[in-house]
Amino acid sequence: MLVLTRDIGETFSIGDDITVQILGVNGNQVRLGISAPKDIKVHRAEVYKRIANKLSQQAAQTQP
């Protein structure tokens, strides 16, 4: 895992198309702004897991 130290307003890039900016820090919370092409889906981990579980359940129901 890459660990970075950034100040508010600073950015880092992921590949050529994704930029992440530190918008703010409040206690234990960090606000991030993510710029990515519309065809790249960006989700929080818990939302991504829910989507993956739902798709898995749908696939299981459609199998003969």
Swiss-Prot record:
Q: Where are the transmembrane segments?
A: none
Cellular component aspect of the GO annotation: cytosol
Query: GO annotations under biological process?
Result: mRNA catabolic process; negative regulation of translational initiation; positive regulation of translational initiation; regulation of carbohydrate metabolic process
Q: What is its main location?
A: cytoplasm
**Database matches in InterPro entries:** CsrA, CsrA_sf
GO MF, one example: mRNA 5'-UTR binding
Question: Which Gene3D superfamilies does the UniProt record give?
Answer: Translational regulator CsrA (2.60.40.4380)
- What keyword terms does UniProt attach to this protein? Activator, Cytoplasm, Repressor, RNA-binding, Translation regulation
Annotated localization: Cytoplasm
Similarity field: Belongs to the CsrA/RsmA family.
Record's function text: A key translational regulator that binds mRNA to regulate translation initiation and/or mRNA stability. Mediates global changes in gene expression, shifting from rapid growth to stress survival by linking envelope stress, the stringent response and the catabolite repression systems. Usually binds in the 5'-UTR; binding at or near the Shine-Dalgarno sequence prevents ribosome-binding, repressing translation, binding elsewhere in the 5'-UTR can activate translation and/or stabilize the mRNA. Its function is antagonized by small RNA(s).
Quaternary structure, per UniProt, is: Homodimer; the beta-strands of each monomer intercalate to form a hydrophobic core, while the alpha-helices form wings that extend away from the core.
- What is the name attached to this protein's record? Translational regulator CsrA 1
Q: Which organism is it from?
A: Pseudomonas syringae pv. tomato (strain ATCC BAA-871 / DC3000)
